A protein has these predicted regions:
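Short, small/polar-rich motifs associated with maturation and membrane association
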Residues: 4-278, 283-284, 290-292, 328-329, ...
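Short aromatic-centered micro-motifs
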Residues: 85, 494, 756-758, 788
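Residues within well-ordered beta-strands of beta-sheet-rich folds
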Residues: 130-132, 615, 670, 785-789, ...
Length: 943
């Protein structure tokens, strides 16, 4: 955010505005220019690493642009407590930020502490994200076009074994098993092997070649397929937005059109967004009455299917197509699926979503600082999908489907919010007072329907609808949800003499989600501030331009973790266990009945988080150096947990209770420095760091076994719920002597993982030798931004990082193991890292020997999979040029800027030590959609 005089910056803080200088709470801010850098269809993705204490993670390179936002660590155990999103003053129930055009956003404020967020009460324990969209400005008529084209490609794909390497690895595993376990050599039929036995009787490979044909019909030719190369592509994305705005003293309006097409780097995947927005405002009766509306309509289409997993494990010897042009399987291997077929056959099964969101409002200036506002907001969504699955087979493979079907799904969430406020403003002498009182009523309704039917007469998508299928109907389903909130709230801000600040908030919320015993709760908050720099005794400190102390305490609630209806005992009709021969017939139809889903608890109440904040804001050298440092402590009580199954209660005997407590504390630091603004070469450096430490302080005894620990001697209490728990791997058995001298460990053998006997009883077992081996919580996270400007050129570089966390590297199960029971069946392909596995010819390797026999149980959680998840990424670098006015004036333009940018340029990770990260991206240690490198070329023009 550009640094301006503090008195100019006005911040929207929920139902009212304040000068930034008068803030006593913790608020992070971003404006439209911040969002343009590293622009994305999801605004929060653009802000990753740019706000202290706001931890944003992405879903890799998935074109559907999903993000997860966590403000100041965990606030619940349910995993469902997300920040409340407030759009143009309307709290939302079902808004994903990819649903709206990020180019329409004027500013984003994140309310981090309880004092700031408590005005939203029961839904604010996860923080609050306030979004204001752009409005027309008085006296200005602008036509603005922003457009860009991007090229996306995955540079950091895993390097997999080719066909020959796979064949050699298969032989190596068989030779090891024969020598260590005494098994006989059995090689894959897809290869022709030439081998002999050496003088010591050990199997020695001479040559391996892929068979010319993999099946007896000679329709599947042996190949050397790069499956990653087959499913990945260089993709082109487009982003275009046209905005027209104007205004006068009597009216202001803004109209925008947007189109975003993000083609995925996996074939036949994409995300498209079509958007339209109209924001208007009219002043009537000599400016005593103001009416207006904010309305946005978006239509989304997306296919976010990822087949990275199948591309990684499919044998390279199998081709994509058979000799007749049909889909090929994997003859001679295990049960595999052709990933190109999966992506191609589903390419027209598109997810569709329509979002209509907006509000109408009326402001009435009653008399001398007294005003009233009423606002009615609506948020409607319509999700629908029609999936057509045709008959298919993979030649030579084990997979086929002789049935076709059509499946349809629809869901219609609707929420509306009616907010009424009465405001009073008083400014006299040294006193400034702002008060707001209000009521808010919210209702959410959702209905959904799904159906699937076999027997498509004609496999043509235009024809294939459920109504014209001929098979039996099955998997009919429906869903419904409804709940309401009613709230009373008030807030007062008081400033004395421009330097003593006081704020108080209270909100009382009621929700139909709770039983009558605990339907209402009250959430208060208080905060104070002291602008020390404005004191007389600070006049001699000329180098100090700002110094303010802040302190706050407040309470927030959470209902997001509460499963719908868990205060009552619901019943359901399910496919299994609910149909009975009511008439006693031994044949004929079974009549559908009901079964209990869970046992209700009418005494469930709100999860409540109290939070204390202490902070200092500072500025030096006429605000050229600014920043803030803050500490917070959060305590959440009455956290919802589900108790274990109680057999005597029968089906659904798993009630929810308020039973857990948790503490969370951390530090936040922000700093920004700019050089002399009159210099020809200008630069600004901004950085932020956030930390959080989470500890569970209480769990019911009958629940504690559901969390890491053994439940006997080693408990999660006092630790984060995000810890990892397992055995300690102690290298590889490299000699038979090491095997013989080690503690009793079922399955131990030369070339296998050695586990520590922590309790010293001479036996490695799961009960007494597991311990805490890491945490997914980082030590700190943040980002640093460099902005440079020389004449008409500008350069922006943004680095983002996470440090001190551990990850469970799921890739390692493929890259380090030829076979793991239940996880990595024999026959799958692997990254080339496995070629360096331990063998009698490679005894110094720390990768376990390749084997088809797994008696050492190496798939279990241990430090072997726990690696350092720290990283530093150059997220974005952008070079722009703004044409001088003498050129743009001739072209009847107000502004013209062109730019080129690169996103996801490089990643630095730990590459040394026992806990080094051995895969390619610590941010995504699973098998998801790989993150692409993106080059963007764009144009901003204003008329």
């Amino acid at each position: 955010m550009c640094i301006r005089d503090r008195s100019e910056v006005v911040v929207y803080t929920g139902y009212m505005t304040q000068k930034k200088a008068d803030l006593t709470g913790s608020v992070a801010m971003a404006n439209a220019s911040d969002l343009k850098k590293n622009a994305s269809a999801n605004a929060m993705k653009s802000l990753q690493g740019k706000m202290a204490g706001v931890h944003i993670t992405t879903n890799g390179g998935n074109p559907a642009e999903g993000t997860t936002v966590q403000i100041r660590g965990l606030s619940s155990l349910s995993g469902g407590v997300k920040p409340l999103i407030v759009l143009d003053g309307m709290p939302t129930e079902n808004l994903n930020l990819r649903d709206i055009n990020s180019g329409d956003i004027e500013s984003i404020q994140v309310l981090k502490d309880a004092a700031s967020a408590s005005i939203y009460g029961a839904r604010a324990s996860g923080g609050v994200i306030l979004i204001q969209t752009k409005k027309g400005q008085a006296g200005k008529t602008n036509i603005e076009y922003n457009g860009s084209v991007s090229i996306n490609t995955v540079l950091n794909k895993p390097t997999l074994m080719n066909a020959e390497q796979y064949g050699r690895a298969a032989f190596q595993a068989q030779a090891y098993d024969e020598r260590v376990y005494g098994t006989s050599i059995s090689l894959p039929s897809a290869y022709n092997y030439t081998w002999h036995r050496g003088d010591n009787g050990i199997a020695v490979l001479d040559e391996v070649k892929v068979a010319e044909y993999l099946n007896a019909d000679q329709t599947v030719r042996g190949s050397d397929t790069d499956w990653m190369g087959e499913i990945f592509q260089t993709a082109i994305s487009h982003n275009h937005q046209l905005t027209i705005s104007n205004g006068s003293e009597k009216s202001k309006s803004l109209f925008s059109l947007g189109y975003f097409n993000n083609e995925g780097t996996q074939i036949h995947t994409f995300f498209r967004q079509y958007s339209i927005r109209a924001n208007t405002e009219y002043s009537l009766i000599k400016n005593h009455l103001k009416v207006g509306e904010n309305l946005a309509v978006s239509y989304l289409q997306y296919r976010d299917q990822s087949e990275t997993w199948w591309a990684m494990i499919n044998p390279p010897a199998s081709p994509v197509y058979d000799e007749n042009g049909g889909w090929a399987g994997a003859p001679g291997f295990d049960d595999f699926t052709n990933p190109v077929r999966l992506l191609t056959m589903n390419k027209d099964n598109i997810n569709n979503y329509v979002k209509i969101i907006g509000n109408i409002f009326l402001d009435l200036n009653i008399w001398k600082g007294i005003s009233a506002r009423t606002q009615f907001g609506l948020d409607y969504g319509n999700a629908y999908n029609r999936a057509v699955d045709g008959v298919w087979s993979e030649t030579g493979g084990r997979n086929s489907d002789g049935e076709n079907y059509v499946g349809s799904y629809q869901s219609h969430p609707l929420s509306y919010v009616w907010t009424n406020t009465l405001s009073y403003t008083l400014s006299t002498g040294k006193h400034n007072l702002d008060v707001v009182l209000g009521t808010e009523a919210t209702r959410f309704v959702q209905e959904g329907f799904s159906a699937r039917r076999e027997g498509i007469y004609l496999e043509d998508r235009d024809f294939a609808h459920i109504g014209v299928t001929t098979g039996e109907k099955y998997n009919l389903g429906s869903s419904a949800d409804e709940y309401t909130y009613f709230s009373l709230f008030g807030k007062a801000n008081y400033v004395y003499n421009g330097k003593y600040l006081l704020s108080a908030t209270v909100r009382r919320d009621g929700s139909s989600l709770f039983g009558e015993n605990n339907r209402y709760a009250t959430f208060p908050a208080f905060s104070v501030g002291w602008r020390i720099k404005d004191e007389a005794f600070m006049e001699d400190f000329d180098f100090l331009s700002d110094l303010k102390l802040r302190a706050s305490w407040g309470a927030n609630g959470s209902v997001q973790g509460l499963p719908r209806g868990y205060t009552t005992t619901p019943f359901t009709t399910d496919y299994f266990g609910t149909s009975y021969p009511i008439q006693g017939n031994e044949s004929g139809p079974l009549y559908s009945g009901y079964k209990r889903t869970w046992l209700g608890n009418p005494d469930l109440k709100w999860e409540t988080t109290t939070q204390t904040d202490l902070a200092v804001d500072f500025g030096f050298f006429n605000q050229r150096l600014t920043g803030s440092l803050g500490y917070y402590f959060k305590k959440t009580k009455d956290i919802l947990v589900q108790t274990p199954y109680i057999a005597v209660m029968g089906e659904g005997g798993e009630p929810w209770i308020n039973g857990a407590n948790m503490n969370n504390q951390g530090l936040e630091f922000e700093v920004s420095f700019r050089n002399d603004p009159s210099a020809e070469f200008q630069y600004t450096i901004s950085a932020n760091i956030g930390t959080y430490k989470t500890k569970l302080t209480e769990l019911p005894e009958n629940v504690i076994n559901k969390y890491p620990g053994d439940g006997v001697r080693d408990f999660v209490i006092g630790r984060s719920p995000n810890v990892f728990y397992g055995l300690v791997a102690d290298g590889i058995f490299k000699t038979q002597e090491e095997v013989d001298n080690h503690a009793e460990q079922p399955g131990k053998a030369i070339g296998r993982i050695r586990y520590k006997d922590l309790d010293g009883d001479g036996r490695v077992d799961e009960l007494t030798d597991r311990t805490y081996i890491g945490t997914a919580d980082p030590d700190f996270f943040g980002g640093i931004t460099f902005d440079f400007k020389y004449r008409n050129f500008d350069l922006n570089m943004f680095f983002q990082g996470v440090f001190g966390n551990q990850v469970s590297n799921d890739w390692k199960r493929q890259s380090d193991f030829w076979h793991i029971s239940g996880s990595v069946p024999v026959g799958k392909n692997h990254p080339t890292r496995l070629l360096d596995a331990w063998s009698f010819d490679n005894p110094d390797s720390d990768i376990p020997a390749m084997t088809n026999v797994m008696t050492n149980n190496e798939q279990r959680m241990s430090t072997y999979y726990i690696e350092d998840g720290s990283y530093l990424k150059l997220r974005n670098i952008e070079l722009g040029y703004t044409f001088p006015a003498k050129i743009t004036n001739k072209m009847m333009m107000k502004n013209l800027r062109v730019y080129a940018s690169a996103r996801n340029v490089f990643t630095l990770k730990k590459f040394w030590g026992d806990d080094q990260f051995t895969s390619f991206d610590p941010e995504m240690s699973g098998y998801g959609y790989l993150t692409p490198f993106t080059m963007t070329f764009g144009l901003n023009v204003t008329f």
